[in-house]
């Protein structure tokens, strides 16, 4: 009887080799694949960061893609004016020029979703006239008292361009457009030798229970906080301060048993709006232990320390950046720094350093 391997044994050996080779390939792929989880409360800027990644690493948006944002931008603009006009009623603020009442009715007659290739001329004209009204401006200055999109002023100031029949959205128009994220979206980018898989999850409270258990093996968490919202209340619960909510959420993520070995990068975002607000809306009104007055650097230090001090793990480092997610040049620089951090973390996780 010969001592050669049976056909069955040969097939078994071949299968084992195939499995081992696949495992080696998977490990190599894993080393070059970065899973990044984007977290933060609603409207903190997560989707804007994803748009920036497309602009920076994929050469931006094609004409067709820009065209596809038009209806979102029209709807955002009209809806923002509607929100201000409704707030004027509840705050009992009259129009400065009562002749503009005709334009108020034009806005209220528009559907929630504006459809079509161009904004109707009467709607563009109504927004242009109303935005110049002193009563509307007074209500806008009190926007922390109601729920208004960050992009409102930008779109109102650009209304003549947006309402033009041949309008094509530019990069800033696209970056500032707002669609509520529900569920989990995955976006893939190639940066150098690395493949980034970025997961964006809905920031509103109702979405959060879907988060944690799905993402135990992510490389990095990018956590965004809109620091300009220190004086605002939650969209979902107008008894809760937005910054307090962000602190609570960061505490739960930073100290979660699921993310003990996961590096966390903290973007303290919307610094442009934060700087504008500090002189007119004292932070001490909302955080009584803050003593820095309207000083921008002192306010930044205070907020940074409030977040970083929540970390209960001595060995876990929180990497922090102050950001303006709509500023492409700044985000390009910050994301390059983030990329360096992630490469180091990835090498460490793979046991190569």
Swiss-Prot record:
Lipidation (S-palmitoyl cysteine): 3
Single GO BP term: G protein-coupled receptor signaling pathway
CDD domains given in the database record: G-alpha
Region (G5 motif): 323-328
Superkingdom, taxonomy of origin: Eukaryota
An example Gene Ontology molecular-function term: G-protein beta/gamma-subunit complex binding
Keyword Hydrolase applies: yes
Keywords: GTP-binding, Hydrolase, Lipoprotein, Magnesium, Metal-binding, Myristate, Nucleotide-binding, Palmitate, Transducer
Entry similarity comment: Belongs to the G-alpha family. G(q) subfamily.
Cellular component terms (Gene Ontology): cytoplasm; heterotrimeric G-protein complex
Annotated stretches, region: G2 motif: 173-181
Cofactor(s) listed in the protein's UniProt record: Mg(2+)
UniProt function note: Guanine nucleotide-binding proteins (G proteins) are involved as modulators or transducers in various transmembrane signaling systems. Involved in the mating pathway.
G4 motif as annotated region, ranges: 265-272
Quaternary data: G proteins are composed of 3 units; alpha, beta and gamma. The alpha chain contains the guanine nucleotide binding site.
Domain G-alpha: residue ranges: 32-353
Annotated protein name in UniProt: Guanine nucleotide-binding protein subunit alpha
Residue positions binding GTP: 43-48, 150, 175, 181, 203, 269-270, 272, 325
